[in-house]
């Protein structure tokens, strides 16, 4: 029923599991988790070297919703969403004379808005990988697109020609492939819009929530993060109520898309765990994360990833301060699919990532 966006500090567990199993986060760990609820999700995909986690995580959520609604299991095309988003973002960037964030990042509402405007297609129909590379790598594409729109905005002429739009679309066609107007899937013919209708998924049925004190609670506001280029609104609630909404949704078979911060010391993809220990200074960090947070990043070593530890009690004030001073951001989107508890009774959230494992 609810699609939820947030940037809360949560204890997170990165392994899918079946109820009643005792599981752990990695070999040799003393953590023992019991599954409370685990919602059906599609297979993990890899965003590769791209900044498109927002598309992968939101579509994963939508795929789970389609299954929950009885529409069957479908792998949807993340790059079809990306392709359409990049087109609309370029149009807006030029109209704003370059005074807009232009990059590969995005927000969950980008996905629902693109589905409403353009529809969606299965992954097999549009891979967004015309050269069949082993993994996506948009390093070159991102620079080419930015160079094009900047050249248009900064052109030393009195008026713009309409030629930049087809030129820009040609670049997207080259790097991601031409968009299908019609296609065959499971023995039937579809357009992107008719296929979307067949899934019985209505983007209007979902809401976005957040928890910040610089806006009134129980009202909508435009979340001030660079990737919110559409300037869409979220519904603001107190942090404790936000967590209650999350737990209620998960316990009633509704998963959620989660805008998270994976630059925190306690986030360790390699250890399959994310938490907020009392003393984060004891976490030894080697290397660094890439700018798009599209892989496991820096190596982190600490006993907190090996056995249950004492964690900070996060308050509304702590959360707000971290957001205000840029310590906590929305740098990575993931899909929360369940709840587990460790041997001490502490709660964690099962999270599906888009880093290929």
Show where each model-derived region lies.
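Catalytic-core signature of thiol
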Residues: 21-313, 320-357
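Bacterial Sec-dependent N-terminal signal peptides
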Residues: 1-22
């Amino acid at each position: 029923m609810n699609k939820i966006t947030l940037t809360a500090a949560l204890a997170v567990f990165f392994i899918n599991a079946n109820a009643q199993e005792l599981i752990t986060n990695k070999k040799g760990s003393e953590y023992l988790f019991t599954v409370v609820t685990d919602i059906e999700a599609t297979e993990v995909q890899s965003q590769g070297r791209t900044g498109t986690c927002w598309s992968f995580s939101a579509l994963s959520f939508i795929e789970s919703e389609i299954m929950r609604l009885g529409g069957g299991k479908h792998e949807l095309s993340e790059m079809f969403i990306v392709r359409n988003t990049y087109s609309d973002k370029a149009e807006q960037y030029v109209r704003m004379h370059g005074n807009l964030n232009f990059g590969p990042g995005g927000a969950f509402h980008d996905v629902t808005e693109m589905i409403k405007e353009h529809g969606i297609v299965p992954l097999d129909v549009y891979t967004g990988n015309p050269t069949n590379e082993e993994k996506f790598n948009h390093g070159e594409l991102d620079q080419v697109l930015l160079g094009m729109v900047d050249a248009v905005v900064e052109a030393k002429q009195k008026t713009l020609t309409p030629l930049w739009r087809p030129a820009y679309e040609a670049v997207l066609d080259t790097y991601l492939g031409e968009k299908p107007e019609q296609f065959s899937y499971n023995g039937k013919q579809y357009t992107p819009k008719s296929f979307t209708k067949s899934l019985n998924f209505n983007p209007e049925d979902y809401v976005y929530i957040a928890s910040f004190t610089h806006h009134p609670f129980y009202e909508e506001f435009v979340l001030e993060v660079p990737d919110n280029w559409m300037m869409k609104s979220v519904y603001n609630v107190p942090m404790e109520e936000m967590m209650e909404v999350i737990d209620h949704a998960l316990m009633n078979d509704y998963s959620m898309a989660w805008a998270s911060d994976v630059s925190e010391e306690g986030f360790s993809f390699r250890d399959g765990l994310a938490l907020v220990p009392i003393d984060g200074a004891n976490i030894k960090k080697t290397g660094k994360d890439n700018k798009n947070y599209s892989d496991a990043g820096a190596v982190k070593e600490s006993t907190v990833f090996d056995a249950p530890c004492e964690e900070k009690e996060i308050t509304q004030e702590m959360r707000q301060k971290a957001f205000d001073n840029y310590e906590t951001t929305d740098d990575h989107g993931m899909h929360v699919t369940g709840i587990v508890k460790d041997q001490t009774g502490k709660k964690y959230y099962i999270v599906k990532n888009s880093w290929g494992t």
